[in-house]
């Protein structure tokens, strides 16, 4: 089972009609990862704290509709986090967050995850906003030490990071507990702080990460291991509606592929294996960006695509 931990929120996206300025869409990076991996046919649970308000109920209902295990969810009366989305001329999304006193940042450490957990995915605001970030950090360290395939997508929201130096140091402290690091080129450059991305990736690998997957927007994605940049996959051409949830779909698809291959160690993969994994993730992300909001594909949709 894959466990995805982190925030669940409501994206307020530009509406298609001229009557409404913004339309609500259920989302949040880790939430999207849980939906995507479950839709791809892999048993998945979501770890978070979700509001008991109407938005929160809708978030839970959508998880259940996609067969996501909700037994690790915590519920609380605090409001749901909101993210106001702006789309640029390339349909790429920028976010403004409303997080003060919201439910997801108040998650507590659930203790050891179920014994049948094989993979753990963390990232985005869940690893930034306290006190929840410390809870997720404890889960990461504990599950890594018991052999779970751990994956991190920092999904940097720079305006939510009050101390960049402290965050980069904290990020470095996670790396010995992370087997798969997936991040966009923008995030990699922000974390590298002036160094070249491949040079930074080598440092992350030296710290304990087994594979670094870099997403490059229209230029596809690639993977860097101890042997260098060993494989890549091009972007699948589609009519892009927006990019919301694209990176989350990549994260979920990579983990789903690894779990389906019964692979716990990314370092065991050959370049040809990585080519298959990256291609699978690229196809899944292409379907997501062809639809409004974060709507990742089902396994059947992916099988029929192209």
Segment roles from a protein language model:
Residues 8, 12, 154-156, 185, ...:
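Generic detector of well-ordered alpha-helical packing
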Residues 3, 141-142, 193-306:
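Conserved phosphate-binding/catalytic region of the ribokinase-like
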Residues 7, 48-52, 155:
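Cofactor-binding loop segments of dinucleotide-utilizing enzymes, especially the Rossmann-like FAD-
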Residues 1-17:
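Positively charged, low-complexity intrinsically disordered leader regions
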Residues 1-3, 62-64, 70-71, 92-230, ...:
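Ribokinase/PfkB-type carbohydrate-kinase core domain
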Residues 18-83, 87-92, 99-104, 111:
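Substrate-binding N-lobe of the ribokinase-like
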Residues 81, 102, 124-127, 285, ...:
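Glycine-rich phosphate/pyrophosphate-binding beta-alpha loops
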